[in-house]
């Protein structure tokens, strides 16, 4: 028996399975598509100035309840109120550093992070070549306890029913994979718009669209196609957190007090030593 145990141990070392990743630190991350702070009414920037302080308090209460170190926001709007008198970055994200991408119609991606947990190394905005909407990804490279991690926030196309654009979303997913294929630590979050959409008809969920990421070696937070967009019936699994080289646990889907038409996704990310 002793020889058998020794033989198994040697085989395990030879295969590399004896190498154990050591957690250097962990951070709380949240992805949320805020629908331009529309108070769950599914319109753009519908909060009047008179309601600004009251509504900001509701958003802050929710954000504080999650207490994320890093927050990725899709469908962001710097104007929290309709007249722009209140700015979201100062009204909602006090204590966070910000990196906000360009606003292109309904598309605007932003990443907020606490300086006590992370420091920015680099950032970039990359627009997708194949698109109907002005879709892009915002990427910020953060130093977390000495480990560089790319955080990517994106919103993919939904108009793949249009002639000439049927493969746009597929190509956008491939672009994300290719651009971060050689990076050891990556967290990609966003509204991926998975599903078959035809105007005037119910959307057909298609969580299998995420398979391309798994085949490329990424992990999914929304592994079982949990619906995150309750406006649709059936509910669509639009939102996800997709990662590699980073551990994930404690995944939760949060209704966020109906402050958006999307659920938020929060999780614990484990940052490991080395590559």
Name each model feature, range by range.
Residues 50-51, 164-178:
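Alpha-helical scaffold elements lining the catalytic groove of polysaccharide deacetylases
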Residues 43-48, 123-130, 155-167, 196:
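Surface-exposed cleft-lining segments at the edges of enzyme active sites
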Residues 53-57, 83, 134, 170, ...:
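Structural motif corresponding to alpha-helix initiation and N-cap regions
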Residues 28-34, 59-83, 112, 140, ...:
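Active-site beta-strand/loop signature of hydrolases that rely on acidic residues for catalysis
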Residues 70-156, 255-256:
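Structured beta-strand-rich core segments of catalytic domains in phosphoester-bond hydrolases
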Residues 3, 16-88, 106, 272-275:
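N-terminal, active-site-proximal structural segment of metallo-dependent hydrolase catalytic domains
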Residues 4-13:
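Sec-dependent N-terminal signal peptides
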């Amino acid at each position: 028996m002793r020889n058998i145990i020794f033989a198994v141990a040697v085989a395990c070392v030879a295969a590399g399975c004896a190498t154990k990743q050591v957690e250097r630190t962990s951070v709380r991350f949240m992805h949320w598509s805020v629908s331009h702070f529309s108070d769950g009414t599914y319109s753009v920037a519908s909060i009047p100035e008179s309601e600004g302080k009251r509504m900001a308090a509701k958003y802050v209460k929710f954000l504080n309840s999650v207490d994320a170190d890093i927050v990725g926001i899709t469908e962001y709007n710097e104007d929290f109120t309709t007249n722009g008198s209140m700015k979201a970055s100062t009204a909602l994200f006090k204590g966070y550093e910000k990196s906000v991408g360009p606003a292109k119609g309904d598309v605007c991606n932003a990443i907020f992070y606490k300086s006590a947990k992370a420091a920015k190394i680099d950032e970039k905005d990359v627009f997708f070549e194949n698109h109907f909407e002005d879709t892009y990804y915002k990427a910020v490279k953060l130093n977390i306890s000495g480990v560089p991690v790319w955080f990517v926030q994106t919103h993919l196309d939904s108009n793949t029913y249009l002639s000439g654009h049927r493969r746009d979303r597929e190509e956008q997913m491939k672009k994300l994979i290719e651009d971060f294929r050689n990076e050891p630590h990556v967290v990609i979050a966003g509204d991926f718009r998975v599903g078959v959409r035809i105007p005037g008809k119910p959307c057909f969920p298609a969580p299998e669209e995420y398979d391309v990421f798994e085949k490329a070696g990424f992990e999914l937070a929304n592994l079982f196609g949990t619906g995150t967009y309750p406006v649709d019936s059936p509910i669509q699994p639009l939102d996800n957190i997709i990662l590699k080289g980073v551990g994930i646990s404690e995944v939760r889907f949060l209704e966020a007090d109906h402050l958006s038409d999307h659920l938020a996704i929060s999780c614990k990310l484990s940052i490991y030593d080395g590559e």
